[in-house]
Design a protein with these regions (language model features):
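N-terminal targeting signals for export/organelle localization
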Residues: 1-20, 26-47, 192-198
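Hydrophobic beta-strand positions
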Residues: 23-24, 76, 155
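Extended hydrophobic-aromatic, low-complexity segments
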Residues: 30-33, 74, 82-87, 100, ...
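Short active-site neighborhood of thiol/selenol oxidoreductases, capturing the structured segment around
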Residues: 34-91, 105
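Sec-dependent signal peptide cleavage junction
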Residues: 38-53, 170, 177-198
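Conserved helix-turn-beta segment immediately C-terminal to the redox Cys motif
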Residues: 69-72, 86-109, 176-182
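Thiol-based oxidoreductase modules, predominantly thioredoxin-like and allied folds used
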Residues: 101-117, 126-138
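Thiol/disulfide oxidoreductase modules built on the thioredoxin-like
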Residues: 127, 137-179
């Protein structure tokens, strides 16, 4: 069991590239449900639906790797989670403040399949970031990202390197500020070394 757990968390270590995700957003969620994924009860049924709709699905995917931003907040959450109901609105406020001065995006992953409940929450709370879920179950997100409770928050850089993880959302501005200061110090040190070398 310990080795299994180590194999799961190894790709999630700070400094690692975040595992990619192939997700469906709210716009394409209805189309995927019409294909029958919302009523498929077994993995065999989902597999058959996947192969039946294989040509239509790839253009619908939103991938983590395709999101372009200097900083990317990756958050896994559930509408029914009491802690998420506190943290997600806080994250929205932080996101709106941060994006005024820094290139930051949020890739918000719903960990359950209740599309209508999720979509209603997004509309009601005006979550204007990237909202995705996995109705096709191709990502195995709970294992891939070691999700045993929600919300689970990661802060990634522009190369999708995990900079921080498992922090409360109110720590995100301080973390980004620290990374910005670190980057500035490295840039100044590099310029100083170039001048000395000349």
């Amino acid at each position: 069991k310990i080795i299994e757990k180590a194999d799961i968390v190894k790709p999630l270590l700070i400094g690692s590239v975040a595992p990619d995700l192939f997700m469906i957003d709210t716009i394409n969620g209805k189309a995927v449900n019409k294909m029958g994924f919302d009523t498929a009860k077994t993995s065999d049924a989902v597999t058959k639906l996947y192969y039946k709709n294989m040509d239509e699905l790839p253009p619908m995917y939103k991938t983590l790797s395709s999101v372009q931003a200097k900083y990317l907040v990756l958050v896994f959450w559930d509408v029914e989670c009491g802690h998420c109901q506190t943290e997600i609105p806080k994250l929205l406020e932080i996101y709106h403040d941060l994006r005024k001065t820094i290139d930051v995006k949020v890739f918000s992953v719903y960990t359950v399949d209740e599309f209508d409940k999720w979509r209603k929450y997004i509309i009601d709370k005006k979550l204007d970031w990237i909202n995705v879920y996995d109705p096709i179950h191709i990502n195995n997100i709970k294992t891939k990202y070691d999700i045993f409770s929600t919300p689970k928050v990661y802060l990634l850089d522009k190369n999708k390197i995990i900079k921080s993880k498992h922090m409360p959302v109110d720590k995100i501005p301080d973390l980004i500020k620290a990374y910005e200061e670190e980057e500035k110090a490295k840039r100044i040190a590099g310029e100083t070394q170039r001048k000395i070398a000349e």
